[in-house]
């Protein structure tokens, strides 16, 4: 974008992002006029192997956007032979206060040539190519599963479902077609709450998750960020269970038999499902305590049970935890869901961000397992 607003004119280089003196709110922008601003491409959800990248026609570059007066942007393109291709890019943001929780607002523009109402192989070239974005406390990386497919180490959801690290923002379809078949701008925005890592780093990630089985191409430009420090928030036991219920959308329903949960409660359906699934059993006296703060031990047990209560290798690990939570705590530490420090003080409340992040990791691991099983037995 060459017609910059006052905010967009505050184009800050990485050195500005590395500043440690924060006001109430900071801002940064990337317009890609001179270079790619340090963004790195990443492609996942396709098999590894010699010549595969060429077969999938994966392309990434700092190129001129084919819109009058647009200047340059980031070009991404790929052929979705796997019916599940994610293609995107990310950038490290440095200089934040280690361990501090931040609230971000991000806007960007995407140039797409896909007109509305189109149909295609496997899905629509517009409505079935989902745009996602997020800010994570871990560097986006691709890892290979047991079948050799590249997967993202972050929770991005799958196609039309968002994740805890990358949320669903929309799709590639033009909102209004002015020039049929030509590239036109589409605006996106999202909010994110993310904690900086031990070195004061965060990662911005943007991309598309495709259900259209052919070539998709687009340009990213004018990425604007604003952020401010924010306080941790405690998550309650009822809200934690409802978070899982809302994300999973289970078909089965049941009636909870907790004496302190009425049918009018916003947690009624979620607790019925959680009790039937044996994810949450209450305090053992018929009381659940939906408004009580969720503790680290309780969070670990819920996630451990959802993961199927896998066998735990103690390997001489000694953790001071409640008997009912010991295996879950060891499992949580071993899988990077909770820190050893938090595990040693499992009776304290867990904050909302830490629980959401841990849940995202567990859900992503389960999703990758399901994808691998489907590839084996479609």
Segments the model singles out, each with a brief description of its role:
Residues 146-201:
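Short, surface-exposed tryptophan/glycine-enriched loops
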Residues 228-270, 276-328, 334-353, 361-378:
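Feature responds to low-complexity, polar/acidic, surface-exposed segments characteristic
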Residues 24-54:
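Extracellular carbohydrate-recognition regions
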Residues 180-187, 195-197, 210-227, 348-349:
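Extracellular carbohydrate recognition
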Residues 65-83:
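Short carbohydrate-recognition loop motifs
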Residues 172-176, 205-214:
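Short beta-strand-plus-loop segments that form exposed binding edges in beta-rich domains
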Residues 17-25:
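Sec-dependent signal peptide cleavage junction
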Residues 80-97, 185-191, 220:
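Short beta-strands within extracellular/lumenal beta-sheet-rich domains
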